[in-house]
Amino acid sequence: FLCFTFNLSQAQQAYQVHQDNVKPSMLMEYEKIAKEFNAASIEHNLQTSWFTAMSNDFRYYYITPIKNFAELDERPMADMAKAMGDTFGEMFDRFDKCYDSHGTYIIMKDDALSYMPEGKSDAPADENYRKWFYMYYAPENAKNMREGMMAVKAFFAAKGSTEYYRVYRNGFGQMEHYYMVSVSAKDEIDSATRGKVNEQVLGPDRWDVFSKIMKYATRMEEISGEMRPDLSYSPKTE
């Protein structure tokens, strides 16, 4: 608990993430219900907000920025549930048939490790395609992993790379330690093209720098996905 308190206080931004692991056979039904829920949220002007992302293996992420622990105790959907009556519960019963597992946890954005243009912290609005690189590590190697991540950032800057990325790390509700690097692009082709260009910019020395992370990683994952503005939500403002 003390470790989590420290991490949250040091983070640039914390996010509550709800993840639905949707069954392939239920993908279209899930999409239908998710759009109904989004429409209901707009109708009732639900007083919370989230960004939605989807991975290529049908994981859906609903990502809400939070400022502190107290926000986790809030019930922003209570008024909406009361107004909708049985329809609200029935909607979530339908959701539950679309996945065998789901859950909620916290991640933290780490601006100190992120590599972004001066004055920028978020991906461009027209870049919804994503590559997510997960690097897991044992707790005993936390210091070495962080130093490796800093070395990669410094290397990108020294080479003048324009392949920018944001870094997130695990938080409350997760069993494993990891860093997740999020790289945006306009689409899959744009991502591949920019990746090849970046390889040329960084040159063969990149492997010496990357090894400062790889030798401490217990495993690594690369996942493709996209942001879903059509399933994202924010309340109306006066």
Model-derived regions: residue spans:
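Short S/T/G/P-rich N-terminal loop/turn motif that feeds into the first structured element of a domain
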Residues: Q10-W207, S211-E238
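Bacterial Sec-dependent N-terminal signal peptides
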Residues: F1-Q13
